[in-house]
A protein has these predicted regions:
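Positively charged n-region of N-terminal signal peptides that target proteins for export
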Residues: 1-4
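Bacterial N-terminal signal peptides
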Residues: 7-16
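A residue-level marker of the well-folded mature domains of exported/periplasmic proteins
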Residues: 21-334
Length: 334
């Protein structure tokens, strides 16, 4: 009898535990690549929100490396499994739009949005105002090199909406033209004394060793390059290799013959800025992207109205930090 009661209690406990687990809402946070330290911080914010909100699971999943088709397949699999919400940093905006079209599952984007024409397919965008990253990168370059010159922009994937917006911010600011809303905008061809180096822009596809090799090659090919401006921290994410290249060209960097201004402010990048390997960093807040993404998905499934910073774009912005050596102490690392 006693054994029977114990067995029944164990069954009830397991059943209750199963019900409790089943009631958790599963929200997927899908980065462009799991091997990118930028996205690690978004994962951390996601996990903190999971504990804070309660009753939800932050499912952090994505391609091991930057692979557009694999990311699309992962999102399609999540939809098929019936998760309760998906937040995705789109590697290929057009392909991702096709993947999420028609689903009833709440979809939001973070870090990298869908194209403007497909914005109706997602409930919100959480992240940086990407065009402004380009604006601030350009402003630093123009302050350091007011007479113009030859610039090389290094980007992520050619189909990545966020990097195309950043590239446009750089070009438009330097050229003194307004945001046309078409990304990427036209290359620089002498506006305000600036041209783009032959072979640029460079596309890394978030392959960090490749990005360092591209940097080394472009420095060798263009000894009079005025500015090297990556729209993401790509070369800095392989610290030893980046530092090897900057040490090789230490004279032209320290003398500011070539200005090196890069997006993002992860800890290793701030070390580079402090050491003089770069002249400026424009930082995002990936932790807040992951954190806010969970809160936004929870509000959506609870039927709550979202509060947008830009209602027309259904955008929730997480802020930027513009960092140079004089203000390095007040800049957020990450």
């Amino acid at each position: 009898m006693r054994k029977t009661i114990i067995t029944m209690l164990a069954f009830i406990f397991v059943s209750i535990s199963g019900i409790s687990y089943a009631e958790n809402k599963v929200f997927a946070l899908v980065p462009k690549a799991m091997n990118n330290p930028f996205f690690d911080l978004a994962r951390d914010g996601c996990k903190v929100a999971e504990k804070e909100i309660g009753g939800i699971e932050c499912l952090y999943t994505g391609p091991g490396e930057h692979t557009e088709q694999e990311q699309v397949q992962i999102v399609q699999d999540l939809i098929a499994k019936g998760v309760d919400g998906i937040a995705v940093a789109s590697s290929n905006a057009a392909a991702m739009a096709k993947a999420v079209k028609g689903t009833d599952i709440p979809i939001i984007t973070w870090d990298s949005d869908l194209l403007n024409k497909d914005a109706g397919l997602r409930a919100a965008y959480v992240g940086t105002k990407n065009y402004d990253i380009g604006v601030y990168l350009a402003q630093i370059v123009m302050m350091l090199k007011p007479n113009g010159g030859e610039i090389c922009i290094q980007s992520g994937g050619a189909a990545a909406a966020n990097h195309n917006e950043r590239m446009s911010g750089i070009r438009d600011t330097i050229a003194g033209r307004a945001d046309s809303g078409t990304y990427p905008s036209a290359a620089l061809k002498g506006e305000n004394g600036w041209t783009e180096a032959s072979g640029c822009p460079l596309y890394t596809n978030d392959d960090f060793p490749l990005s360092v090799q591209q940097m080394e090659d472009i420095f060798a090919k263009h000894p009079n390059l005025t500015a090297f401006v990556p729209t993401g921290g790509f070369p800095q994410f392989v610290s030893k290799a980046f530092r090897r290249v900057t040490e090789k060209h230490a004279d032209r960097i320290s003398s500011m013959k070539t200005a090196v201004v890069i997006a993002d402010t992860l800890p290793m990048q701030m070390e580079d800025l402090d050491a003089g390997r770069t002249h400026g960093q424009v930082g995002q807040q990936p932790y807040m992207m992951g954190y806010k993404a969970m809160h936004v998905l929870k509000d959506i499934v609870d039927g709550k109205a979202l509060k947008f910073d830009n209602p027309s774009l259904k955008a929730i912005y997480t802020g930027l930090d513009v960092c140079m050596k004089p203000n390095i102490g007040s800049c957020i690392a990450g």
